[in-house]
Design a protein with these regions (language model features):
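Conserved alpha-helical substructure of the radical SAM core
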Residues: 2-144, 226-227, 238, 373
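Short, flexible loop/turn elements at secondary-structure junctions
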Residues: 41, 89, 116-118, 150-152, ...
């Protein structure tokens, strides 16, 4: 996000979001779309069982949206600023570059963000290069962020991710992405860590290693139990007190490096500091600490064409199916069910530290935003 976009697009949108939150105007289009493009995954993570969806026949792979269906959905949505792609493993979709091209054609995002388990370096690099060429041709100002996951150093990473040899492929992927970033100025390489009971004891080692790689940014978020991940009841989440202490140490390192950042990068890192403090309080207090704008600023699209207010409420409180309304986003977005779910969120009947929603919440909450400025 650059300063011009924030001042001319993002911040003015927050005024409309606040009015919609209080029921004073119809809900405008969201600024963030997260699209789970597939539930196929080669990882066998201790923190996530999404890979079991097809082997255990929870759903059928043939139910996933086609490229043409995706184009129809995007065409009905209008502009989205942040386009987050997730999975499953996104790079296992052969048409991933075509999905990004459809997003460029219809959503016109400023940022495209894709995480990866880094198990298929050649596929990741070839598809990334195809996407970068699409951006070069159609949207040279759009940034592409690829975020390999790093949950431990060496053997621990393979143990947590459940695939022997993942560590070596991760290093290969990061190296090749870093080389690709030298050719394409709009490619950003980021590292992400899921903080769980399996790696909470070695976050300092992980962070020191990440910084030695020279990547542009690093972020972490807490492991959560979600129906989406089929991990309800799994002992994966650190206690609130543990997470708060971990994030306190992590924040100290971020603050120490703030002076080395460019002005806007300092604001971005400061937003993360606010998030870490907020997430620690949410996990500890088990409540919404600031108002949540899920289903207003952000929306989640499943591989099957269902809209969720967020991936945490997901199966429990879906907004509706786009396949049932001829792929017309507005019909679900402005439905009575969507209004009912937004009331539930506003009444603070749920709470979670979901990162991409939390950043939108911070931008819409003036006291929190001022902390980052």
């Amino acid at each position: 996000m650059n300063a011009k976009d924030f001042l001319t697009y993002i911040y003015p949108k927050t005024i409309a979001f606040k009015l919609a939150y209080h029921g004073l105007i119809p809900v405008p289009r969201p600024i963030t779309l997260t699209f789970s493009v597939t539930n196929v995954c080669q990882s066998r993570c201790k923190t996530c069982n999404i890979w079991k969806i097809y082997p255990d026949k929870h759903r059928s792979f043939s139910d996933e949206l086609t490229t043409e269906e995706i184009r129809k959905i995007f065409k009905s949505m209008g502009r989205i600023y942040f386009f987050n792609i997730s999975g499953g493993e996104p790079f296992l979709r052969k048409d991933l570059p075509e999905i990004v091209e459809a997003a460029i054609d219809f959503l016109r995002p400023a940022i495209v963000h894709i995480p990866t388990n880094a198990l298929a370096p050649e596929k990741i690099i070839s598809q990334s290069q195809r996407m970068l060429e699409i951006l070069k041709d159609k949207a040279p100002g759009t940034a592409l962020t690829i975020k390999p996951s790093l949950d431990g150093v060496g053997r621990l990473h393979d143990e947590i991710r459940g695939v022997k040899g993942n560590w070596d492929k991760l290093l290969e992927t990061i190296s090749q992405l870093s080389e690709l970033a030298k050719q394409y100025h709009n490619l950003h390489v980021e590292i992400g860590t899921v903080v769980s009971n399996f790696n909470k004891h070695c976050l300092d080692e992980i962070e020191d290693f990440v910084h030695s790689l020279g990547v542009q940014s690093y972020r972490n978020e807490i492991a959560e139990q979600r129906e989406e991940f089929l991990n309800i009841g799994d002992p994966i989440t650190p206690t609130g007190a543990e997470y708060a202490e971990l994030m306190k140490r992590f924040a100290e390192k971020v603050r120490a490096n703030l002076t080395n950042k460019r002005p806007l990068a300092r604001v971005t890192e400061s937003l993360r500091l606010v998030y870490y403090e907020l997430a620690s309080r949410i996990v500890t207090e088990q409540r919404q600490v600031i108002p949540c704008y899920a289903g207003i600023t952000n929306v989640h699209l499943t591989p099957y064409g269902e809209l969720w207010p967020c991936c945490v409420l997901g199966y429990a409180k879906p907004l509706g199916s786009l396949r049932e309304v001829d792929y017309d986003f507005r019909k679900v977005w402005h439905s009575s069910r969507a209004r009912q779910i937004r009331r539930s969120i506003k009444n603070r009947e749920c709470s979670c530290p979901l990162a991409n929603q939390a950043y939108s919440n911070i931008i819409c909450h003036t006291p929190s935003l001022l902390k980052a400025l």
